[in-house]
Regions:
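Non-catalytic signal-transmission and effector/linker regions of two-component phosphorelay proteins
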Residues: 1-16, 22-42, 64, 124-143
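Alpha4 helix (beta4-alpha4-beta5 surface) of REC/receiver domains from two-component response regulators
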Residues: 81, 102-131, 135
Length: 143
């Protein structure tokens, strides 16, 4: 278990979670909020079941989310469509992405999409997801 101290801030970290399975969406949200609260951090998670909703919710000229957590198998356009869409906007293309999927990915890099981690949805633990989020946000938290 990693133990890094974090001074609480008033800043709210915003995550866009694209997941079409409501059980996984609720599980991811609940576990992340609990872990962030334990560290004195404010966390806002906006959940979307498809790419169209998420793209429509991206702020125009406002502060974008700090992180995308993305399942690639979604209803309608898939997660790769979302990655291509955000890659076409300079301000959005810099936002880190964590892919959470039951698919196996080839040994290739997705750095051009700013994918910082790929987690297996069926075997990952809440701690693994939290650690990946902390790493993606480049912050020190207690895991």
């Amino acid at each position: 278990m990693l133990k890094n101290k974090l001074a609480p801030t008033k800043e709210t970290i915003e995550i866009f979670l694209l997941e079409d399975d409501p059980i996984f969406s609720q599980l991811f949200s609940k576990n992340l909020k609990k872990a962030f609260q334990k560290n004195g951090q404010n966390l806002s998670i906006r959940c979307f079941t498809n790419c169209i909703e998420a793209i429509a919710a991206l702020p125009d000229g406002c502060k974008p989310p700090d992180l995308f957590i993305l399942d690639v198998l979604l209803i309608g356009p898939d997660g790769f469509t979302f990655l291509n869409e955000i890659a076409s906007y300079p301000d959005l293309s810099k936002i880190p992405v964590i892919i959470v999927s039951s698919l196996k990915f080839p040994d290739q890099t997705y750095e051009s999409y700013n994918v910082v981690d790929i987690l297996n949805k069926t075997t990952m633990t809440p701690q693994a997801l939290f650690s990946a989020v902390v790493k993606a946000l480049k912050r020190d938290f207690e895991v």
